[in-house]
């Protein structure tokens, strides 16, 4: 009898784990139809940097920020110390710089999913102080997440959900979304998450697993196949003349003629 009870318990849907699927794509076209024709009441969540857009200059690109963090850590700073030291400068550069889309198909996909009355929003590690510049950047590519109408309870002050963007204010993805889900009266039938970093996709998957939410994680590698925007030598020139952020072309011209010396 005990064996029979254990067998029934193991087979019971109430104790089964939610399905998880993680895929890697070079272009959003590879998964667009899977997303659009998914009949579940899912949430589509997208990362911002290097998914919706990337910095158009070497200095405004996320790679400059990441390399700067690595440089400070090599000098003995903790990850938190490096972030706190570099973030204000990165934020100022974002106000000066410009952005460019990675794939024009992504805004089209977002619009189509929104037209299906599905929940679509962005999720970023960006700090709360970066909200204004983030909305300005999204506006330059005519991208809006204003439609989500989620009846969440009050959120902790460490995160913000504004105009359809969840600002996690975190070094690593995961906790911000977990806190947001904790505030929801009802959870989605499924979460589809798109990010260019594998470790972010895995962390969001862990959150979904804890909440028993079926999950499709999409590792978006399209930026790797584009001509690189971040070039260390160009970024150095732009940093020297950062009072007015130079384009990559202008910085390359200065570098070529050694005017940066």
Swiss-Prot record:
<protein>
    <recommendedName>
        <fullName>Putative outer membrane protein TC_0650</fullName>
    </recommendedName>
</protein>
<keyword id="KW-0472">Membrane</keyword>
<dbReference type="InterPro" id="IPR022565">
    <property type="entry name" value="DUF2608"/>
</dbReference>
<dbReference type="Pfam" id="PF11019">
    <property type="entry name" value="DUF2608"/>
</dbReference>
<keyword id="KW-0732">Signal</keyword>
<keyword id="KW-0998">Cell outer membrane</keyword>
<feature type="signal peptide">
    <location>
        <begin position="1"/>
        <end position="17"/>
    </location>
</feature>
<dbReference type="GO" id="GO:0009279">
    <property type="term" value="C:cell outer membrane"/>
</dbReference>
């Amino acid at each position: 009898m005990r064996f029979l009870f254990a067998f029934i318990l193991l087979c019971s849907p109430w104790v089964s784990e939610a399905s998880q699927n993680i895929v890697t794509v070079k272009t959003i076209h590879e998964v667009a139809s899977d997303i659009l024709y998914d009949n579940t009441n899912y949430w589509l969540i997208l990362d911002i940097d290097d998914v919706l857009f990337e910095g158009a200059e070497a200095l405004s690109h996320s790679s400059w920020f990441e390399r700067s963090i690595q440089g400070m850590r090599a000098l003995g700073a903790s990850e938190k110390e490096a972030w706190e030291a570099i973030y204000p400068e990165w934020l100022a550069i974002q106000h000066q710089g410009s952005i460019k889309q990675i794939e024009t198909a992504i805004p089209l996909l977002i619009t189509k999913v929104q037209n299906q009355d599905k929940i679509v929003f962005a999720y970023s590690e960006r700090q709360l102080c970066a909200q204004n510049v983030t909305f300005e950047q999204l506006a330059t590519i005519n991208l809006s997440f204003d439609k989500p109408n989620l009846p969440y309870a009050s959120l902790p002050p460490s995160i913000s959900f504004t105009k359809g963007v969840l600002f996690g204010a975190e070094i690593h993805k995961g906790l911000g979304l977990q806190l947001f889900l904790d505030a929801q009266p009802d959870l989605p039938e499924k979460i589809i998450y798109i990010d260019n970093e594998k470790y972010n996709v895995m962390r969001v998957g862990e959150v979904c697993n804890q909440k028993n939410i079926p999950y499709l994680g999409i590792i978006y590698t399209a930026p790797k196949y584009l001509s690189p925007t971040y070039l260390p030598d160009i970024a150095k020139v732009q940093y020297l003349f950062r009072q007015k952020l130079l384009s990559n072309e202008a910085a390359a011209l200065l570098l070529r003629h050694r005017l940066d010396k």
